[in-house]
């Protein structure tokens, strides 16, 4: 067993230091950098943190559905955090279900989940070259989201990518905040770690490996610290019986210097190196560090400036060191979060992972009497949050998130004289002051499909329910126009709310572009563009290819207007909601 352990460790070390680091060094000679995903399914022979740590850049991966991403992105972000890498990429939205049916609103919550886990550099998967403009939607495969010029919503994809850029930028600022470092052990091959005991809600963690502990980790101000500045409050050892003496000696030094370490004692060395003396060293060190612990009872052992914690769950351990949750909210809420910190500023990313509106209080562990702001990555707006209060160790802020909405809660402005500001509510009541009833003049982009260039709708409907099959199966761009009279009698910001659109839209008001919508709350701020009296609104909507592909399944092949290399849509499939569905309202907040 020791020989096998040494061979496996040798393989992992050589893959990391000869293959990855070797390729990195050669690349640098030619002005290049290496980028890799630090895992591999169906036969990964390395240790994921060490393997990724030797590369210049690191990446994870997730699909728009399913399980892929459950371990890959934490593997990448932990590697990036402990090895001091600013950008942590992810091959994103790798597959999106059936061809040409997915659109950015369906991708958002999944992407936000992994932003909260530490991803901060989005790599879109994928863009396939299209050799022809006539064969649409064109070349595709069974995998991959169709981020290419022949997709119907490509002209409005900037609404989505601007969002991704804003989130990426914010999450690249400062350093990641995590309270716990879970040691993954020294065994190989290894593609992920375990969080045992489990971390309570409101805390973040990273995995950490022996290389970084032994070489880089030190104690500063009672915190486990890495050279690039990231700090942890507790180092958790895995439930294993083995550890090399060299590593256990470093753990001992960390504790005596003031660190908090938690876990069970090792019994012997896993390696054949210096056997049997190494086992005796382990027994001697373990006896010193776990002084008389019986293996079951809770025990706190004081060693130098630090402590060894035994027989505890994570909540008990965190309570012992008076470590409050980094963020606290109702545990039943479907919210994920991440936290970055730079000098004088705390940046929290929060995401509603549900399809429901959420109104809740959140307690943030911030110091120095900082005032909160909400930075909206969808539209770039900044909202002062006037309504907040002091808690034990932080600030409580009433918050509101629309379905699948995300936001940055930024603390950067210090309050004078420690006075809490009480003014307007954070989220004033939204009041509808006008409904745009039409009629609506609607233009279709593609007249080659037998559509009239313009039709008039007395009222908005889901086009997939239109009695005209050509309209019902339409895919592409269409423009809605109407006039309306408005006189403003309210105080507050005015919004044009589309409420329900299939699937994305850009809006012009009085010939001025005022923004686009692709996710909740599907509204744009028109305060600076709406006038008293007559107004003209023009809304450019894009659908997906799904309905046209289904419609063509009713046609003989020679009569079809679409061509896709991989197309499994049939007559039996349901149509997707399409067009401007509404109701369209003017709201004041």
Language-model segment annotations:
Residues 1-477, 485-489, 587:
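Carbohydrate-binding surfaces of carbohydrate-active enzymes
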Residues 401, 507-509, 530-531:
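Short, well-ordered loop/turn sites that connect or cap secondary structure elements
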Residues 406-407, 494, 532-552:
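Short, well-structured beta-strand segments enriched in hydrophobic/aromatic residues
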Residues 484-510, 518, 537-541:
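Aromatic-lined ligand-binding clefts that engage carbohydrates, nucleic acids, or primary amines
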Residues 396-399, 523-528:
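Exposed aromatic-hydrophobic patches
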Residues 415-438, 543-586:
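Glycine/proline-rich low-complexity spacer/linker segments in large multi-domain proteins
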Residues 460, 466, 500, 517, ...:
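Beta-strand/loop-rich accessory regions of lumenal/periplasmic or secreted enzymes
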Residues 387-389, 514-518:
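Short beta-strand segments within Ig-like beta-sandwich modules, predominantly Fibronectin type-III
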């Amino acid at each position: 067993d020791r020989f096998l352990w040494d061979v496996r460790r040798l393989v992992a070390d050589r893959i990391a230091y000869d293959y990855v680091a070797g390729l990195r060094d050669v690349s640098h000679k030619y002005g290049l950098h290496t980028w890799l995903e630090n895992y591999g399914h169906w036969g990964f022979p390395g240790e994921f943190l060490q393997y990724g740590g030797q590369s210049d850049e690191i990446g994870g991966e997730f699909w728009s559905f399913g399980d892929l991403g459950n371990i890959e992105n934490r593997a990448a972000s932990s590697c990036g955090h402990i090895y001091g890498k600013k950008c942590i990429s992810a091959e994103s939205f790798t597959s999106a279900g059936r061809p040409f049916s997915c659109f950015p609103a369906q991708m958002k919550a999944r992407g936000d989940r992994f932003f909260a886990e530490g991803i901060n550099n989005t790599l879109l998967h994928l863009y396939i070259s299209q050799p022809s403009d006539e064969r649409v939607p064109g070349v595709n495969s069974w995998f991959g989201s169709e981020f290419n010029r022949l997709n119907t919503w490509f002209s409005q994809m900037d609404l989505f990518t601007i969002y991704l850029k804003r989130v990426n930028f914010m999450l690249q600022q400062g350093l990641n905040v995590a309270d716990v470092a879970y040691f993954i052990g020294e065994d190989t091959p290894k593609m992920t770690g375990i969080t045992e005991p489990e971390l309570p809600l409101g805390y973040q963690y990273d995995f950490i490996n022996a290389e970084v502990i032994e070489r880089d980790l030190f104690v500063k101000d009672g915190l486990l610290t890495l050279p690039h500045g990231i700090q942890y409050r507790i180092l958790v050892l895995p439930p294993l019986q083995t550890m090399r003496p060299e590593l256990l000696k470093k753990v001992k030094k960390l504790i005596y210097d003031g660190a908090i370490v938690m876990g069970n004692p090792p019994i012997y060395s896993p390696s054949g190196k210096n056997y049997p003396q190494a086992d005796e060293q382990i027994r001697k060190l373990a006896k010193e560090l776990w002084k008389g612990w019986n293996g079951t009872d809770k025990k706190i052992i004081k060693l130098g400036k630090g402590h060894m914690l035994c027989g505890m769950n994570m909540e008990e351990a965190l309570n012992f060191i008076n470590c409050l949750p980094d963020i606290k909210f109702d545990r039943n809420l479907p919210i994920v979060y991440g936290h970055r910190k730079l000098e004088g500023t705390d940046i929290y990313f929060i995401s509603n992972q549900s399809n429901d509106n959420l109104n809740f209080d959140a307690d943030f562990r911030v110091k120095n009497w900082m005032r909160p702001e909400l930075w909206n990555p969808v539209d770039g707006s900044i909202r002062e949050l006037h309504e907040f209060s002091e808690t034990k160790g932080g600030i409580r802020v009433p918050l509101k998130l629309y379905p699948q909405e995300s936001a940055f809660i930024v603390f950067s402005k210090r309050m004078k004289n420690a006075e809490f500001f009480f003014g307007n509510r954070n989220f004033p009541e939204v009041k509808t002051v006008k409904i745009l009833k039409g009629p609506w003049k609607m233009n279709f982009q593609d007249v080659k499909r037998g559509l009239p260039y313009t039709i008039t709708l007395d009222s908005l409907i889901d086009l997939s329910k239109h009695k005209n099959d050509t309209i019902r199966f339409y895919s592409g761009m269409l423009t809605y126009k109407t006039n309306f009279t408005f006189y403003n009698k309210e105080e507050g910001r005015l919004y044009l709310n589309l409420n329900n659109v299939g699937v994305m839209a850009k809006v012009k008001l009085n010939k001025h572009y005022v923004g686009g919508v692709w996710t909740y709350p599907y509204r744009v701020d028109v305060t600076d563009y709406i006038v008293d009296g007559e107004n003209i609104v023009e809304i450019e909507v894009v659908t997906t290819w799904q309905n046209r592909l289904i419609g063509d399944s009713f046609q003989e092949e020679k009569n079809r207007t679409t061509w896709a290399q991989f197309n499994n849509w049939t007559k039996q499939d349901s149509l997707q909601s399409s067009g401007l569905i509404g109701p369209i309202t003017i709201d004041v907040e």
